[in-house]
Every structure is written in structure tokens, then in C-alpha cells.
Amino acid sequence: MTDQCVVSAPVRVRTRRLDVKETGALPAYRALAEHFGPDEVYLLESAAGPARDRRHQFVGFGALLSLSVTDRVVRVEGVPALRGLLLERAGALLEDGPQGLRLRTAGGLWPLLRAMRDMFDAEGSASGFRFGFLGFFGYDTARYIEDLPHLIENRPGLPDVRMVLHRGSVVTDLATGRCELLLHESPYWPGLAPETVTGLLADVEQAWPDPSADGFPASAVTDDSAPEVFANDVERCLKHIAVGDIYQVQIGHELSIRSTADPADVYQRLRGRNASPYMYLAGIDGHRLIGASPELFVRIEDGEVTMRPIAGTVPRSGADGGIAAGVRLRSDPKEIAEHTMLVDLCRNDIGRIARPNTLDVPDQLDVEGYSHVLHLVSTVVGRARVDTDAFDTIAALFPAGTMTGAPKIRAMEIIESVERSRRGLYAGALGLLDVGGYTNLALCIRTLFHHEGVYRTRASAGIVADSEPGAEWTETLAKMSATHWAVTGEELL
């Protein structure tokens, strides 16, 4: 908890709000990324889905402070005064190591994140995002919660966890169309004239050309698995299920696509092909994250914790737009059983931090459609206890049971023994954390990771007792079809 950290005077922050002309999220991103650099700009938008998930779009810019943790090694970058203050506050949690500062214990991650949050005296919010951080929680964040085996080789790349404070954002209310420029000001960092940003936005072309019009760049695709290899993996999992080791486990594989395609163009194509509630385009250390996730990991709003687990998937097909496939999905005993099991796991996870008698499942077994697949979706809610915060909630829920299986820890152990490459941010979470408690994190699926001319995308299938290997392989291809097409212009199925 924060009592392990030095409590120095917080950084006072004032937020200026100015109405600006609405430009569209991607054109604004392109203009701001050209000025500030793509590592310092992010785009989050809701392009489809239920109204409760389609509220705002954000384009943040100008990184002031970033905290990254990889294998317990801690890296803090940004404005020197902010960097020094965070290290002062968190010093008791850190020690010197061969690669620099590192966490004394894995569990020290959570008080470290609290130390960063509590540095600021700002107008935060429990009901929406005003001032806070863009947060990335990779799948291996689980290692800061549970003691898990480490059998798959690490590869250089994204950190396990990263939190970034930006100096401002362009926020559009999708219900009203109102667009605001938020600028955060403090004596701790140089000021930024609003005219700098409004001038950039004034020159934006809203009707950006379709990047598919001139065709797609040449690409070369490799897979870290194959149908027969994946079938053997499924059989291994079925043996674990047969002896009662697990009830369900999510296993997958990864495609690597070498291409010269521009990440912003890929995002534009993905958005056009597979508009989703949780879309993102962001940079970390020269990597680009491009996603069209259908699934909420967790939203914390005015003390209410919400998860919307997706479990149960069929390819979208047929002249009726998938209506018949949706009816079959909602009446398939295998899919219903798998979904119910994972909804129960969500209830269990939320119950760890919820007030008594507040758990509820207000929506069950809804069918939601996307470009290539149909999903079964439910909503699970609970009221957070007053002695918990956003980081307690994330630690209690992470990783999403829909990406591991049940029981969760044993499923993660089996995933580590079966899969061939580390998941990275895939199956983790990405989104916004306000200093006032509001949190909105998407589950990182239907995602591309771009670095040095290579795009990687990944998908998993849920293995249960009556799974058929060929069908599960096809499900993974259906889930990767939109991201694969956005880079290559070619269908997987």
C-alpha cells in the first residue's frame, strides 16, 4: 500500500478545457503524431457496439511521465522533476540490480502504481476520465499477482506494465458531438499554448483517403503453429480436462506478417472492416499497438465494477448476415456451457473486491456481431468495497478468465506449457485510469503489434471436453481474419 512510500507534497495540476472543432479521431491522431511523435500520442475510440460502450473518443498527446516495469526492472522517463519525485516516493519499493532499478518484490508493483497516481493534486473523477494515465497491462502482469512457471522464452519488446501521463487530450462526446481540448498545466513542466494544438487541428483533413484504394503492400506471413501441431496441443488439453485438472483452457497461436504498411493506414482499414467498441492506436518505444477489441476487461465508474465477458464464438456466415448462425450459437449446449462457466468465474473474481450482496448479471447470453465472427456476451457487475481501489480491482480480476480458462491458475500453467511464444500485451488490458478512480480498460484481443516492419497478431480458442481440434483451429483463424486482412488485404478463411 502507499504507506510503504514517501509521502511528499503532491504536484498541483490545473486542467484547462476549451471547445474545439471536431475533426475525427484518426485525422487528429495523424496531425498530433506528426508534431509530437507517434510514441507520444494515442487514440482510443468506440466505433461500434452497445451505447453504454460508445461514449467518448480520446486522442492524447505529449507524454510527461512514463513508468515501465519488465521482469521487475523499473524504468521511469519524462520531465526530470516528475521523475525525481516518483523515485523519491517509491524508493522503499526499489533496489539496485544489474539492469538498473528493480522491484524488491513482485507484489511491489501495485504500491508503485499507487505512488505514481498519488503524486498529483488534480481534479480527477470517479465517473469519467479527466486527469490520469494511459495504462498497459500485459498478460505477464499475472506474474505480479501469482507465482507462475516461466517456460516460454522472453523476447525483447513491450513491458509487462506501463503507465503514461500525457499533457493533454482531444475528447469528443459521441452522444452530443461536443469536442474539447483538455490541457493539464503545472509549474513542474513547460506550458503548451492552446494555439499550438488548435492550429494543428485546424489543418486536419477530415476525409482521409482510403488506404486500400491503391492496393496493399506485399507481405510475407509465418505462423508459430500449424493445424496438426495445434491439434496435438488440443489433445494435450483434453487429457487435462478428462482427469479433472481443468474445465476449460484458452490456447492459441501467433501470425507474424512482414509488411511495409503504415500503422495508421492499417488502423484505418481495420476500423473500416471491423468497427468495435474498443479501438486503439498507440505507441510504446517504437512499437505500435493497433486494436479493434470487442471486449471490456473492466470498467470502474462511481464505485460500480463491470465486466463484459465474451465466451462462445462462431464464424459469421450466410446470406442473412449471420442471423441463423447467431440463433445456433445461442442454442448450442457446448457454447452455452463454456459461456456460463466463464461468467461464473467473472462473478467469483469481482466477488473478491465487491460489497456483499451486490453481484448481479443484468445481461446474459447476448449475441454481438463483428465482421468475421459472432460472440456470446454477458454483463457482470458489483459494487466495490470502500477499502479497495482500482489497482486492487485489477489485481483481483487479472487476467480475464475468458483468456485463460478455469480454474484460472491451473489454466495459466497449462497455457505456459503448450503455447510457443509469449503473449505480450495480448490477453492483457489497455485503457484509461483517472486519479479519481474511474477506470476503463479493454481486453487486448483482435490486436496487431508492429515493430521494425513486422506485424504480429494472435488468437485463442477455448478448449472444453467436447472440443474438436479442427473447429478450434478454424475459430482462431476467424478471430484473426480482420487484423490479417487489414495488413495483407487477404482473407484467412
From Swiss-Prot:
Its EC number is 2.6.1.86. GO terms for molecular function: transaminase activity. It comes from the Bacteria. Keywords: Antibiotic biosynthesis, Magnesium, Transferase. Disulfide bonds: none annotated. The keyword Translocase does not apply. InterPro entries: ADC_synthase, Anth_synth_I-like, Anth_synth_I_N, Chorismate_C. The keyword DNA-binding does not apply. GO terms for biological process: antibiotic biosynthetic process; L-tryptophan biosynthetic process. Its cofactor is Mg(2+). Belongs to the anthranilate synthase component I family. Converts chorismate to 2-amino-4-deoxychorismate (ADIC). This is 2-amino-4-deoxychorismate synthase. It comes from Streptomyces globisporus. The lineage of its organism: Bacteria, Bacillati, Actinomycetota, Actinomycetes, Kitasatosporales. The gene is sgcD.
